[in-house]
Amino acid sequence: MRIVAFASTQQKELNMNQYQNILLAVDFSDHGQAVAQKAQSLAEQFNAQLHIIHVLDNIPMPDTPYGTVISLDEDSSDDLLETEKNKFIRMSDQLGIAAQRRWLIWGEPQQEIIRLAAQERIDLIVAGSHGRHGLAVLMGSTASGILYHAQCDVLAVHL
């Protein structure tokens, strides 16, 4: 595992003691646990609140507009959605993340991660990087999009 950190362009110097809210963006890839452990370690190191987001973009939800927060308390008739919810809840529980800092959202990952980071005043986004094309070869398309558009620092954990 290799770690690549990017400071936001608005921040003149990187002062990691200022991190109070860290957002872990998960996609449940094979190496996602390594990204989660890094985010948890940073949250502990800086005594920061750890938030978690998983953006559903692979499940057909024709009557659901992008940006809709999926309830973790309601059962769904869609088996794939229930599987994703259960993985998300299990990881959130393992990391000890409080319910009010858990975000399961239907939409486009880059857009929803950036929107939530601004909404929740996130200081650092931690995401895995495992893309295959263009700049994404280095970072992953979602991670590279977050890097260029987020208003906070981004930590890309190379998988």
Identify the residue ranges that each predicted region occupies.
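General small-molecule cofactor/ligand-binding pocket signal
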Residues: 53, 101-105, 155
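Short beta->alpha linker loops
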Residues: 83, 104-108, 130
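Gly/Ser-rich helix-loop-strand patches that form or flank binding pockets
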Residues: 1-8, 115-159
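Active-site phosphate/pyrophosphate- and oxyanion-stabilizing loops and adjacent acidic/basic residues
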Residues: 40, 89, 144
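Structural beta-alpha unit
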Residues: 3-17, 92-125
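Generic structural signal for helix capping and beta-alpha/helix-loop junctions
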Residues: 60, 109-112, 134
